[in-house]
Design a protein with these regions (language model features):
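Extended C-terminal subregions enriched in glycine
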Residues: 428-477, 734-736, 740-743, 750-774, ...
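Terminal amphipathic helices with adjacent charged low-complexity linkers/tails
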Residues: 72, 90-145, 276-379, 537-591, ...
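Acidic/polar, glycine-rich intrinsically disordered N-terminal extensions of enzymes
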Residues: 1-72, 86, 583-584, 591-596, ...
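Acidic, glycine-rich flexible loop/linker segments
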Residues: 543-552, 762-832
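Extracellular/luminal Protease-associated
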Residues: 274, 278-285, 501, 713-758
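Long, structured ligand/cofactor-binding scaffold of large enzymes
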Residues: 49-243, 258, 358-371, 375-462, ...
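Mobile "lid/hinge" segments at catalytic clefts and subdomain interfaces of large enzymes
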Residues: 190-325, 329, 413-434, 463-570
Length: 847
């Protein structure tokens, strides 16, 4: 590392850094590397042995997208839905160490962690001045056990900060306060300046890309690895350069921009996973405007949506954090990473996007990609049934929410001024609508109150109902009772309007099929009418008032933006890690290990997934097939966190505990409950085990030839030390929950998965859990004609990457030899597998 080292003296203090200019002077072809890749190069060089440096640099020069680079983030950002299960896993590792007569207190996170409790706010109380406090009080009461565990973790583990509920959304808090852009790290007794690199479990962590910070969305398994001091590996990504030109028209705002851009990028179907924005047009975009764009990277299939550091970045850091930013500016200038236009950099692909062509729109009704221009909405509607007090397309839920829009002062003030104009014209929202306002931080409430604008939200019923994800994540609470009855009785297709980034059918509320995304100002405007079935640009809203009569000009909005006292951005966070009185009342437990409750529905240890064995070869004899699945099985169907049906095994489990599932809208909060996850496995009407006649969580009991509960069948084999094998067709295990599925497969004792093809993230998670992934080389599920009575023998020595072997499938004494490929893609994966999985390896070799 010293060969590329340089030093910077600030106020008499010596700081070292990896000098990208020095590297580029030796390897000039790197000069045109996109800035986001230069940041990856710096991290990889800094965290890799010198003997690998030339190989790393050559791979960047030659754009070797198959080459794995090792990265070590500086900080881990967790939300509570994934963060609590991760901490439960970490706590259970302490149990594992203690049970093996090792010092459990040595196990503490090796990376700085900020865990923000933001996904558990249930928006039940709305439209009163007490709503915020009532919802917070109810949240802490209903999540008491989860939060008690968090308080224990914060007292027990070093490097862990907990942001209690009631402060906002993690991504917005990160943008406004936590992100530092550069970090100081101790390396070999030297102080190093490094560009901040953040890993996190929320898919919208990319919001920090707007500040020139690289981020990576990771699985819970990778998060645990980081906590144990291990890095993460990614292949050098392709980078799409998006050249921005022009500027937005007066009626168009940043929300319109990001939805137009999302639609544009989805249609282009680029293969690049990193996006870097540049061009003259970005000079017209505020930092908050860029953050609105970066937030949606996941929706346009990108891992990063990056803006290089420039004057906007430096100014935003200075005004929101009240810190001396010369340190940041000097570092990025030294590294040649401040670049307003990036015209001379080489991208794998380039697309042009003209801001002048952006049109005001809404998005929906069932995905965040389908842009609809305002004058075309009515023509996109499909059903027009009537009830007694409602019709199809009537709005029953309106929410100003999400870090996507509430982190943008322009959008917030625009909505406030529209509300003001509506009130002054005698307008009000439709009384059938449940309205709520859940900002992503307390900063929003402070500057709206300072500008005397909050009262206009409140007068229309958009009182602040809490600070968190709320409706955006589906925690919308109940609709008004008469409204719910009306929808169910007449089977109506009603609508929600919100300023978030999620709108798949039934995700915001189980009774709402059509969910429309739009800017906060349009949320209010549509709520004044009470339906989406009209042309909001041309038709009367009410009382001869049109949208143009109440829509504020950009100049009017910007006048207010200039008046914001940005000290609110630092003062709002003074008690960020302390919490309010509700949080402080939660009992604290002081012990080196956690006292688990076997009957808990939310907090359970997973120590059973760790092994203290070593396997030098693969040797499975007389394995039994417990499931044969068709093509395109999704992980979110294998383990679903939707409300279970009353005839499901999950519902029966809760009944046995005396737990009323009807009162618990989001069982995803129970991700740490190993018993629930086992019951939830395959408990879905979209899953059909080919071996069985019944749909869902069933397997074939061979002796009786009856369908029995899947986990019961697996348990029988596990107790007898019989290898447990699953077969699947093409495209097995895509979409979310793949880490949870891999963990539960390990927990119940699955040894081998054999498939035609598999999702890559799922494959990686299986290997990390010590489960053998085998790809059928020439055969298919249909050609094998499996019945479940077969025995399977699998043997392999001298394991290597993508090794081809033959397995034996035996039925009635007849041996069918089938070629399969062991899908280990790196030497490290083989090492992890031999140790019983990634986490077991780390426990044995790192801890």
């Amino acid at each position: 590392m010293e060969e590329f080292e340089n030093k910077l003296i600030i106020d008499g203090n010596i700081f070292y850094y990896i000098d990208l200019k020095k590297i580029i002077s030796i390897y000039p072809k790197l000069k045109k590397l996109p800035n986001t890749l230069k940041l990856l190069l710096e991290n990889s060089i800094r965290n890799t042995d010198k003997s690998f440096h030339s190989q790393i640099i050559d791979s960047f020069i030659n754009k070797n997208h198959e080459f794995d680079i090792k990265l070590i983030p500086d900080r881990l950002l967790l939300e509570d839905l994934d963060g609590i299960p991760i901490l439960c896993d970490f706590a259970s590792m302490r149990d594992f160490l203690k049970n093996n007569n090792l010092n459990e207190t040595k196990l503490t996170p090796k990376i700085f962690i900020d865990l923000i409790v933001d996904h558990s706010l249930e928006v039940e109380s709305v439209s009163t001045k007490y709503s915020c406090n009532n919802n917070l009080k109810n949240e802490i009461s209903s999540n008491y056990e989860r939060y008690k565990f968090l308080k224990w973790a914060s007292k027990t583990f070093e490097n862990l900060n907990i942001v209690p509920p009631g402060f906002g959304v993690g991504n917005q808090i990160n943008l406004e306060y936590l992100t530092t852009i550069v970090c100081i790290k101790e390396i070999n007794d030297k102080k190093y300046i490094v560009p901040e690199f953040i890993a996190g479990t929320d898919s919208h962590i990319t919001m920090a890309n707007a500040m020139g910070v690289n981020t990576i969305n990771i699985s819970s398994i990778d998060a645990l690895a980081l906590m144990l001091g291990e890095g993460i590996s990614i292949q050098i990504p392709k980078v799409l350069g998006v050249r921005i030109s022009g500027e937005l028209d007066d009626f168009v705002n940043d929300y319109d921009l990001v939805m137009n851009l999302t639609n544009f990028l989805k249609e282009k179907k680029s293969s690049c996973k990193f996006i870097e924005f540049y061009g003259e047009g970005i000079k017209k975009l505020s930092l908050e405007s860029r953050a609105t764009i970066s937030n949606m990277a996941n929706e346009f299939n990108a891992d990063i949506a990056y803006f290089s550091v420039d004057k906007q970045t430096i100014n935003y850091a200075q005004k929101t954090r009240d810190v001396d930013v010369h340190f940041i500016k000097e570092y990025y200038e030294l590294q040649d990473l401040i670049n307003d236009e990036n015209e001379n950099l080489e991208y794998d692909e380039i697309l042009d996007f003209d801001l002048n062509l952006v049109k005001s729109c809404i998005v929906g009704p069932k995905d965040p990609y389908s842009k609809v221009l305002l004058d075309k909405v009515a023509s996109k509607l499909e059903s027009f049934k009537r009830g007694n007090i409602l019709r199809d397309n009537d709005i029953v839920l309106a929410s100003i929410n999400s870090c996507l829009s509430t982190a943008n002062p322009f959008l917030m003030i625009q909505a406030a001024l529209l509300a003001k104009n509506a009130i002054e014209n005698g307008l009000d929202i439709n009384p059938n609508i449940k309205a709520s306002f859940t900002p992503g931080s307390k900063t929003v409430e402070k500057y709206l109150r300072q500008l005397n604008l909050l009262k206009y939200f409140e007068k229309l019923g958009f009182n602040i109902s809490g600070y968190g994800c709320g409706v955006c994540y589906g925690n919308s609470g109940s609709l008004y009772p008469t409204i719910e009855s009306e929808i169910e009785n007449y089977k109506l297709n009603v609508s929600s309007v919100s300023s978030g980034n999620r709108n798949f059918s039934n995700t915001l509320h189980p009774l709402i099929k059509s969910n429309w995304l739009m800017s906060p100002a349009l949320v209010i405007a549509y709520s004044l009418k009470g339906t989406v079935n009209f042309n909001i640009k041309a038709d009367v809203i009410s009382k001869d008032i049109y949208l143009k009569d109440i829509w504020p000009t950009n100049e009017q909005v910007l006048e207010y933006v200039q008046l914001i006292n940005f000290k609110h951005f630092s003062t709002s966070y003074y008690s960020l890690f302390t919490g309010d009185s509700h949080w402080l009342e939660i009992n604290e437990v002081n012990d080196t290990t956690y006292s688990w409750n076997d009957k808990s529905t939310t907090i359970q240890p997973f120590w059973e997934i760790y092994e203290n064995q070593y396997y030098d070869k693969i040797n499975f004899n007389n394995g039994r097939i417990v499931s044969v699945l068709k093509d395109n099985i999704l992980c979110e169907n294998i383990i679903s966190f939707s409300i279970p049906k009353k005839d499901s095994l999950t519902f029966q489990y809760f009944n046995e505990l005396g737990f009323h599932i009807d009162n618990f809208k989001n069982i995803e909060r129970m991700k740490s409950n190993k018993f629930l996850l086992k019951k939830r496995l395959f408990d879905n009407e979209n899953i059909q085990n080919i071996l069985c006649s019944k749909v869902g969580a069933y397997s074939k009991e061979i002796e009786s030839n009856n369908d029995i509960n899947f986990t019961d069948c697996v348990e029988i084999y596990k107790k007898s030390n019989v290898p447990i094998i699953l077969f699947a067709g093409k495209n097995f295990g895509s979409l979310k929950n793949s880490d949870a599925v891999a963990k539960v497969f390990k927990l119940i004792g699955v040894n081998v998965l054999i498939f035609e093809s598999i999702d890559e993230d799922f494959r990686k998670n299986l290997v990390k859990m010590g489960i053998l992934p085998l790809k059928l080389e020439n055969d298919s599920i249909s050609s094998l004609s499996l019945t479940g009575v077969e025995f399977v023998n699998i043997f392999a020595e001298d394991l290597s990457v993508n090794k081809l072997i033959e397995i034996e499938i035996i039925q009635s004494g007849i041996v069918n030899k089938v070629k399969v490929r062991i899908l280990f893609k790196t030497i490290n994966e083989i090492i992890y597998y031999k140790n019983g999985g990634f986490l077991s390896y780390l426990l044995k070799n790192v801890v």
